[in-house]
Regions:
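Histidine-centered active-site microenvironments of extracellular/periplasmic hydrolases
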Residues: 1-26, 36
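Active-site rim elements
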Residues: 5, 24-35, 48-51, 113-120
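Conserved beta-strand positions that form and line the central face of beta-propeller blades
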Residues: 9, 18, 30, 60, ...
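C-terminal cap/loop subdomain of S1 sulfatases and analogous C-terminal strand-loop tails that border
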Residues: 26, 38-41, 45-106, 111, ...
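A contiguous, mid-protein "functional segment" used to position or interact
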Residues: 117-148
Length: 167
């Protein structure tokens, strides 16, 4: 039942705790920020008083809070990884290029065992996550978005829906 989880986008893997301490860091703060490991170089540079590295994809954890975060693996040297995900901390959408997409309610299903993609395929919340994922992948030159030929699939217009054929 967990064979269709694709790559390594499990919530237990992509949601990693972080502890920061030192000058300029507020003590005893427990925050459920939506962030990315790519935010660490930018955050550390800002704490040390440096400008962020040119072309850095992250943003400082001490700046404006994000509403969503994306995750993708472009490890073509190790194989073909064709899943991308976005979460707002409550809903998690996984775009699977060659298979059925995944949608999880992280508040109700922390183990990501009940894929809601069929029930909520046309929901405004999912459409918003797809649009945000597309914008982020486009901004960072993701190889599946770069040339535009998969835009319709990610944005939901041309995604194959095998569960609708059986009805």
């Amino acid at each position: 039942r967990m064979l269709d989880k694709h790559c390594t986008l499990y919530q237990d893997i992509v949601r990693v705790p972080l502890i920061l301490a030192g000058p300029g860091v507020e003590a005893q703060v427990n925050d459920n920020l939506v962030s990315n490991c790519l935010d660490l170089p930018v955050t550390l540079a800002s704490l040390l008083g440096f400008a962020p590295p040119e072309g850095a994809h992250g943003q400082s954890l001490f700046g404006p809070a994000r509403k969503t975060i994306t995750s993708s693996g472009n490890g073509q040297q190790f194989g073909m990884f064709n899943s991308r995900m976005i979460t707002d901390g409550h809903l998690k959408y996984v775009w699977n290029l060659t298979d059925i997409d995944e949608l999880y309610d992280l508040d109700a299903d922390q183990g990501e065992c009940h894929n809601l993609i069929r029930e909520r395929y046309d929901s405004p919340a999912l459409k918003a996550l797809r649009a945000d994922l597309y914008a982020d992948l486009k901004a960072h030159g993701d190889p599946f978005i770069r040339h535009g030929w998969l835009d319709g699939q990610l944005l939901g217009e041309r995604k194959h829906k095998p569960w609708r054929e059986s009805q």
